């Protein structure tokens, strides 16, 4: 450990958010540096790579206006997150600076933004139900504490509105201390205004990290890490159950690709860096529960699939790491269904651990199975209807077609209304009874 900062004025190249500094001694990967602009403003950076006496630095801010003789101070520290329960109800930018008009709270502790991985042997099984207020999730693809469940969307679909609905309506069905950590990446000014209004209407505790599209790209890589550091502190140091909602991971991965290109790294699939899988895992795997400790971190990241392609590297790699997916449908959106969740390709792999007696209702599994089965049959019969026409189908087939329509119109569609789990299941039972399918 050095006793003082080492200051260099040997910048050899500036490429976007990257600096190359020569004749540097005793630097280490991950070390935080401070760069001074000509106007006296300072900006932080991080050592990414060391080759001999040349150091590559990723700058957490603007590099325009920097000269080759700008002072670069190596601090011997790493990027730290200031943490305290007082951050609840606050809004920060991607560098953990307050943007809500209030000063920074007095930190109770500082922790590395990268966090500490949970020992696999210390992980507790994800279980217990988290109510989102959305029937397609709560009744049919249940979210449980400690799970990581992504939302797969497409360009033009209302993923923003779905995220806001979860943000405002999520809570623990059985009560308890519950906080939402909201991380928004690469927002347009319109989206920024929308989410700030949504945060102003929050009735539960929240901590928000908001990065706009016109802010430094590197902040899009920092914001999720700060958000997860905050979530881990509240969960494992304060015993709270925390839901981390990140939108949009596609913007995060695009930022990762942009920085990788500036570093002149060899590209992988679709130009994304080959380490994108491990980078995403370093975020997603911070969700979970720890044996013998109260609190949990549950993650709900939103992924916009480029070109509606679920095999694109971003949703593809996300699917390998996470425990299911909630899929938004363009067809349902065109029918006016909100939220447009297509329950057939959607899946919550841990649903069984969070439903049933003691969690939701003893008949939850049976109701969900019947709804799935009959809706899947009705959807399949729509293809036959397109060929032979409705008149050429049996009376039983026409009942299934009507059920599929009613399922989308009355069960999946709920507009801006919030439904609790009992209301969602009761609505499903009523639908089955109306079509005489409750025992089928």
UniProtKB/Swiss-Prot annotation:
Keywords: ATP synthesis, Hydrogen ion transport, Ion transport, Transport. Gene3D superfamilies: 3.40.50.12240. One of its GO terms (biological process) is proton motive force-driven plasma membrane ATP synthesis. InterPro entries: ATP-synt_VA_C (IPR055190), ATPase_a/bsu_AS (IPR020003), ATPase_F1/V1/A1_a/bsu_N (IPR004100), ATPase_F1/V1/A1_a/bsu_N_sf (IPR036121), ATPase_F1/V1/A1_a/bsu_nucl-bd (IPR000194), P-loop_NTPase (IPR027417), V-ATPase_su_B/beta (IPR022879). One of its GO terms (molecular function) is proton-transporting ATP synthase activity, rotational mechanism. GO terms for cellular component: proton-transporting ATP synthase complex. It holds the Pfam family ATP-synt_ab. PROSITE patterns: ATPASE_ALPHA_BETA. SUPFAM superfamilies: N-terminal domain of alpha and beta subunits of F1 ATP synthase (SSF50615), P-loop containing nucleoside triphosphate hydrolases (SSF52540). Belongs to the ATPase alpha/beta chains family. PANTHER family: V-TYPE PROTON ATPASE SUBUNIT B. NCBIfam families: PRK04196.1 (NF003235). Produces ATP from ADP in the presence of a proton gradient across the membrane. The V-type beta chain is a regulatory subunit. This is V-type ATP synthase beta chain. The gene is atpB.
